[in-house]
UniProtKB/Swiss-Prot annotation:
Keywords: Amino-acid biosynthesis, Aromatic amino acid biosynthesis, Lyase, Pyridoxal phosphate, Tryptophan biosynthesis
Enzyme nomenclature, EC number: 4.2.1.20
Entry protein name: Tryptophan synthase beta chain
Stored PANTHER family: TRYPTOPHAN SYNTHASE (PTHR48077:SF3), TRYPTOPHAN SYNTHASE-RELATED (PTHR48077)
Residue(s) carrying N6-(pyridoxal phosphate)lysine: K87
Function: The beta subunit is responsible for the synthesis of L-tryptophan from indole and L-serine.
Classification via InterPro entries: Trp_synth_b_CS (IPR006653), Trp_synth_beta (IPR006654), Trp_synth_beta/beta-like (IPR023026), TrpB-like_PALP (IPR001926), TrpB-like_PALP_sf (IPR036052)
GO molecular function, a single term: tryptophan synthase activity
Subunit organization: Tetramer of two alpha and two beta chains.
Chain coiled-coil ranges: none
Family indicated by similarity: Belongs to the TrpB family.
């Protein structure tokens, strides 16, 4: 199929979907390309971002956790966005696209529940029906978000197949869409999947990096040495990285979930520890067995519990423009506690992975003068029960 935009990032990406979905993807690409050139669409999107979602979000300088070091650390506060995470940005854009295409229903998948909440709120706002697929395990561990979705009128459908987590929810959502695309838009929640989704999601998240660049120049008079973001599928990270890719003096650091430790096999770090394959409509690194079956990923944070990664991250890794590292559950938990105790901010466990790596950089080289920005992609209200249970089991509370 001929596309309007390049469906690949180097060798990664593409449109590996059943033929039945090709017209839906073509229609989506055409709608996106025309919307990007339409001042009225852009004005409507920007108005929602400003007056409904609460953009621009703050860039907060950490006051206490850098004490005794020469590191200056800022947090890009996507946790302050309406809905509680960066997810709200791009769902507003996709919901407007759905209306533009004449769709009346939204289908979505969710892991931590943040994309589900964002999809539900955008659907409620714009008068769209919404059904959300969620792994049964995630329904259990993210009950506050499940109730939020239902309060906003969404139907939440637990998925019991496979590992009953995000990858299984993705499969069910795609299956639904293949039979309902004439009336429904599939609101994919990350910068992965078949073209044009990775490009659409990046463009509807790129204001994170654009705002960060303007804010850090105003505050510090220079660009940061590095911007750091957690990577599951990779939407918050690509939103932060996009405006810095051509700023070659700025390091781009993506943090994958190391789970119980890479050596245990219980992690979600396919970029550094997976093999290239085809899954979820794209060619990308993924966790797979010797015979090519998709392996179950694992992370303390439901939103990073994904066995593959967006194709642009795979490309940035392959050309050496971005560095990808991993952080274990325990390291993320320590960072979570540190930010709560010393800055009065409760971060999402996903974002805590990025913070943990920044703290590691700071502690490993306390004398080094460095200016770092962490994308605090979401707030941790949804995670307090998970953290409570872990700390209680350890006898720490």
């Amino acid at each position: 199929m001929t596309t309007l935009l390049n469906p690949y990032f180097g060798e990664f990406g593409g449109m590996y979907v059943p033929q039945i979905l090709m017209p839906a993807l073509r229609q989506l690409e055409e709608a996106f390309v025309s919307a990007q050139k339409d001042p009225e669409f852009q004005a409507q999107f920007n108005d929602l971002l400003k007056n409904y979602a609460g953009r621009p979000t703050a860039l907060t300088k950490c006051q206490n956790i850098t004490a005794g070091t020469n590191t200056t650390l800022y947090l890009k506060r996507e946790d302050l966005l309406h809905g509680g995470a960066h997810k709200t940005n791009q769902v507003l854009g996709q919901a407007l696209l759905a209306k533009r295409m004449g769709k009346t229903e939204i289908i979505a998948e969710t892991g931590a529940g943040q994309h589900g909440v964002a999809s539900a709120l955008a659907s409620a706002l714009l008068g769209l029906k919404c059904r959300i697929y969620m792994g049964a395990k995630d329904v259990e561990r993210q009950s506050p978000n499940v109730f939020r979705m239902r309060l906003m009128g969404a139907e939440v459908i637990p998925v019991h197949s496979g590992s009953a987590t995000l990858k299984d929810a993705c499969n069910e959502a795609l299956r639904d869409w293949s039979g309902s695309y004439e009336t429904a838009h599939y609101m994919l929640g990350t910068a992965a999947g078949p073209h044009p989704y990775p490009t659409i999601v990046r463009e509807f998240q790129r204001m994170i990096g654009e705002e960060t660049k303007a804010q850090i120049l105003e505050r510090e008079g220079r660009l940061p040495d590095a911007v750091i973001a957690c990577v599951g599928g990779g939407s918050n990270a690509i939103g932060m990285f996009a405006d810095f890719i051509n700023e070659t003096d700025v390091g781009l650091i993506g943090v994958e979930p190391g789970g119980h430790g890479i050596e245990t096999g219980e992690h979600g770090a396919p970029l550094k520890h997976g093999r290239v394959g085809i899954y979820f409509g794209m060619k990308a690194p993924m966790m797979q067995t010797e015979d090519g079956q998709i392996e179950e990923s694992y992370s303390i944070s439901a939103g990073l519990d994904f066995p593959s990664v967006g194709p642009q991250h795979a490309y940035l890794n392959s050309i050496g423009r971005a560095d990808y590292v991993s952080i274990t559950d325990d390291e993320a938990l320590e960072a979570f506690k540190t930010l709560c105790l010393h800055e009065g901010i409760i971060p999402a466990l996903e974002s805590s992975h990025a913070l943990a790596h920044a703290l590691k950089m700071m502690r490993e080289n306390p004398e080094k003068e460095q200016l770092l920005v962490v994308n605090l992609s979401g707030r941790g209200d949804k995670d307090i029960f998970t953290v409570h249970d872990i700390l209680k089991a350890r006898g720490e509370i």
